[in-house]
């Protein structure tokens, strides 16, 4: 998946988006500044995908900066100098001195880096090979900068086509989305305008395309209805990886080692690199093939064109078509996003949202023609998304006028196709999301600069000291200085970080959690505030109807068996439930519980019949569905009068008690007291309204407005529903709080119910909870009021911190809206101190999350993926729980990716081994069991590769999706996040220490003639590689710790521990070096010959053993372990790797195998000196360990940020 973003219009020379825009753009040439400033305005403000568009014109080959300075100046200058004998050699070309070769090598290196920088950065590529063009009509390419976390910058070709009016139309395609230039009005590139914002009258009266010319124009404008990708071949993907900066840097280092005559080591390192990159490319190709299968498979569909229904392939549909949608015997998926015009559908949206509850879709034929389609508000009820499956449909009534499909399907209008659909958007997230996971780039850069200071000092020392010997080869000396400088940039870093994140992705997938944006995993380790929705997240879906209150005196709850017939009718008819062909009832769990409680039966033709009481059944005619903003739902139903065929129409309404109060013509005097008291006990309360409308004509019934039903109602009771907490909610919330996190509830439910649940779960631990009451009259102030009404306080203008120390705070949607309008600064100060946000609309949930982020808190949001989409998307870590999913898996028989998922044809996948097992004769049972075992082994191996997020696993709602409905998944995400964060931090410490030890040994010791043999370097590299591989595969502990990890790489603890540990190692190395020198024969010459063949010596053997021991000690000391990850003894592969390294060091020190020692160029060490080395190594380890642990105790445990 990592390179999936390469698909699309890449630059011809293979430039790949890796650039990070430092301050905007490359320096302009001779263009005026005013025009440059206008550049980004070529894209509309607020575009979801593209942040800026910059037009460019490609330069002729010889004018490009990758060719001109080198071919036109530097190479000719070098040849001219060579011809003129400037380098000081004779007439023979064979006698080229090293200085000339050095200059030539520097020019070639500069040339290679210049060319490669165009591959690494699109910004650099544009600066080198293109010229900015301020008239888009003259441009040939555009540089497209995406919005944050939406992929990488790309240079894409600018296409020219003829428009409908005969004028030239400029367009480009970025991440499969087409943008066209509006040259007449806006002078901007705009995404293709789909017909999604028109009045309902436009869709209701639409008759599709009447002429072939209209169809051709639409096909030209919108393209085909395909959401597929091309999988690049192996060589193309490998070339992309082989030109990546770190890979090139490693190859450069290998070249330097070859020049320094480390042949075995160089070949070993290069082979490992190539093998690792090749395996990644193979995995990438497998992943891309998987993603490719996710698109919809074309099938025939009925479309109304040229005034008649005709079958066409689903990939030929264009926006504006009228299509027939219905249940398909082949289980075909809906091919695109459509607006339902006529007929009703029940749709399984699991492939898109992950929700297991099928959704009911209503037509817009009877809605107000003047209303404008709002995709955000109307999509849940009237839009059927591409990639979903219609499980049942009710065709339009034959008696009505309008289009009727020949296949008895429902009539729908095509809104969006291809990658522009909701399914296409999810596919694009999987395809073009952030490519590689990296640490904070700025911090990494500062850290490397910090190490570079030491490397420059070491290189300067080598050069100054080395040039004191006039006979010394300056070329070799320069090579050594270059090697020292390269040693501080750890080339393993990107691989290590990728391994750490991939380990977390695999672990989460095994826990039925899927992630579409892996870069968010380290954020989970930094989370400070955890926000939860209440209904369906903290509380269970298995609801209990206690009865109906308000029918008798006080808050007494009447059992459902004793309620009057009007209340029965209101409960039986006011819902959005539907019945499937197999008799299954689908819809909201609360409504299911209510219908079950009153014991009425719903039929397929929208009729309800009582089973427990003797009264007439009801026929539901119109539903005005529940909306979060309105907080109510109403229906128009009818029943037959006794002894007559005349229909008596009724209106039934249910909703929030405070919303319905003004709609009742009569209600009990203690109305507010009743619902308030019951809500305080934690129950969910909905008011019920009813009224008889008498006789209506069919026309009147069809045209009745919502407002006509929702007035002059008779109060028929409060339905009281208990929402029990999920089994593990209490334990999980306690664990999250104990792990130093603040927990907050953000719900659309009643504030009193929310506060009760918050108290049960210990969100609230104060004696009194204050709810902010907005002013009842103009000119008055907001006031805090306790739940029982005993405390009333004015809204403090000062810091809310003092108030929060004494009371728990609850903010309602009304209070939030009032403060937003009157005192936004006070609201921002208040938000971090509030424990419960109640009666908030989805947009307000989003506002709370974005406010917390703006205040600097790393925020997690956990919700149900339908009402909470905005909040989940904006949180640093958004986790969608799937409704009606099991809370836990009892026995895990298969891996998540083996679970039945809908393939592109809609047919359920079956296990290969299951097919093999079916119907085999007894003689074949033996080989089959072996095949099964082999399949299991292969599956287990595949288990360890990064999981591909499939449609149905991922949700369009959030970056993380849990297939289980328990909030235990929050603990899993935080554990994996902390583990990844700590792994990154320890990786930096280890790489920094190894780099510093290497810089010292390559400088001071190098000048003393200490160098390692080729075999020595190879053995050291092999042992290091094993440790690096296994340290990144650490697993988190079972429980979360109170201690928080350090959120950043660059901090006082890390700097001090690296410096102190290096100081201890430095002293040990200097001491042993001097001791070894004292036991060696005295040097005769003044200057050491640095270029003679490697000769084993006591000094070399001592320093080599010491350096190896220090590097292994660095791993053991800096492995973090508890409380964030398993301890060192539990990380078996790393323990074995360190044990092998330790045995190798002991074996080399004791000289137990003389042949082995001589092979690696080690001499026999005197026994008394062996003891000295062992003691120093032990002391070095203990002191470095002590330094790290003391610093960790004082500086290594950050505290949770307390709101001020």
From Swiss-Prot:
Residues 199-230, 295-435 are annotated as: A-domain. The keyword Endoplasmic reticulum applies. Keywords: Acetylation, ATP-binding, Endoplasmic reticulum, Glycoprotein, Magnesium, Membrane, Metal-binding, Nucleotide-binding, Phosphoprotein, Protein transport, Translocase, Transmembrane, Transmembrane helix, Transport. It catalyses: [protein]-with a C-terminal TM segment(out) + ATP + H2O = [protein]-with a C-terminal TM segment(in) + ADP + phosphate + H(+). Mg(2+) binds at residues 533, 535, 864. Residues 543-724 are annotated as: N-domain. The active site is at 533 (4-aspartylphosphate intermediate). Pfam families: 2TM_P5A-ATPase (PF23143), E1-E2_ATPase (PF00122). Residues 886-949 are annotated as: Arm-like. Residues 88-95, 265-443, 1011, 1073-1096, 1154-1166 are extracellular. GO terms for biological process: extraction of mislocalized protein from ER membrane; intracellular calcium ion homeostasis; monoatomic ion transmembrane transport; protein transport; transmembrane transport. InterPro entries: 2TM_P5A-ATPase, ATPase_P-typ_cyto_dom_N, ATPase_P-typ_P_site, ATPase_P-typ_TM_dom_sf, ATPase_P-typ_transduc_dom_A_sf, HAD-like_sf, HAD_sf, P-type_TPase_V. It is a multi-pass membrane protein. Its EC number is 7.4.2.-. It is an enzyme of class 7 (translocase). ATP binds at residues 533-535, 626, 684, 749, 864-868. The chain crosses the membrane at residues 67-87, 96-116, 244-264, 444-464, 990-1010, 1012-1032, 1052-1072, 1097-1117, 1133-1153, 1167-1187. Glycans are attached at residues 287, 420. Contains a large substrate-binding pocket that recognizes alpha-helical transmembranes, which alternately faces the endoplasmic reticulum lumen and cytosol, while remaining accessible to the lipid bilayer through a lateral opening. The translocase alternates between two conformations: inward-open (E1) and outward-open (E2) states. Undergoes a series of conformational changes with ATP-binding, phosphorylation of the Asp active site and subsequent dephosphorylation in a Post-Albers cycle (i.e., E1 -> E1-ATP -> E1P-ADP -> E1P -> E2P -> E2-Pi -> E1). Endoplasmic reticulum translocase required to remove mitochondrial transmembrane proteins mistargeted to the endoplasmic reticulum. Acts as a dislocase that mediates the ATP-dependent extraction of mislocalized mitochondrial transmembrane proteins from the endoplasmic reticulum membrane. Specifically binds mitochondrial tail-anchored transmembrane proteins: has an atypically large substrate-binding pocket that recognizes and binds moderately hydrophobic transmembranes with short hydrophilic lumenal domains. This is Endoplasmic reticulum transmembrane helix translocase.
